[in-house]
């Protein structure tokens, strides 16, 4: 059970100390750069969840003790990767989760980057379309003002890829390439 992705990345499993006790967390600066309307923001525990004075997302856990368990975890803890079928106590079932080798979202980002090198406006349009259609609840994302050049567009695209593929090892290849 220690050699599966879920054992290392899921904070909710009770059968591995790697994901559960090590508790991989997103960098607070990266977390704070995520739009408040972006549903991906709920892949990590918001520090506001512990403050009754602040409004925060109602996180759901597969664990019986749910909210109490999440409140014990550190701020910004990853809950993006979860045990299969919610089986946090049974590694034979919970460890049989999907492994993110390649996702269709990667193709959207590749297309937007490639188009931006041909025609910056087209790359901007594709990224805006993807973000508003698939990530930002209610729309409103627009990277036009952040993308006055291919370089500034690539920086914004890479930010979105870092958020999208956090913990999946995909962006490492972009960092080497760029």
Regions found by a protein language model. Name each.
Residues 1-7, 11, 28-178:
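Acidic/polar-rich alpha-helix caps and helix-coil junctions
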Residues 14-23, 92:
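Acidic/Ser/Thr-rich, low-complexity mid-to-C-terminal regulatory regions of eukaryotic proteins
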């Amino acid at each position: 059970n220690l050699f599966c992705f879920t054992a290392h990345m899921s904070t909710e499993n009770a059968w591995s100390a790697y994901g559960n006790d090590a508790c991989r967390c997103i960098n607070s600066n990266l977390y704070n750069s995520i739009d408040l309307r972006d549903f991906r923001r709920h892949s990590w525990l918001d520090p506001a969840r512990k403050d009754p004075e602040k409004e925060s997302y109602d996180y759901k856990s597969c664990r019986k003790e749910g909210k109490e368990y999440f409140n014990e975890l550190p701020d910004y803890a990853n809950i993006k990767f979860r045990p299969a079928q919610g089986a946090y106590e049974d590694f034979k079932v919970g460890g049989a989760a999907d492994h993110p080798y390649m996702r269709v979202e990667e193709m959207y980002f590749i297309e937007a980057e490639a188009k931006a090198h041909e025609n910056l406006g087209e790359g901007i349009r594709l990224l805006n379309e993807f973000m508003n259609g698939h990530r930002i609840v209610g729309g409103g994302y627009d990277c036009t003002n952040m993308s006055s050049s291919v370089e500034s567009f690539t920086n914004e695209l890479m930010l979105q890829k870092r958020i999208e593929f956090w913990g999946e090892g995909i962006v490492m290849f972009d960092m080497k390439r760029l």
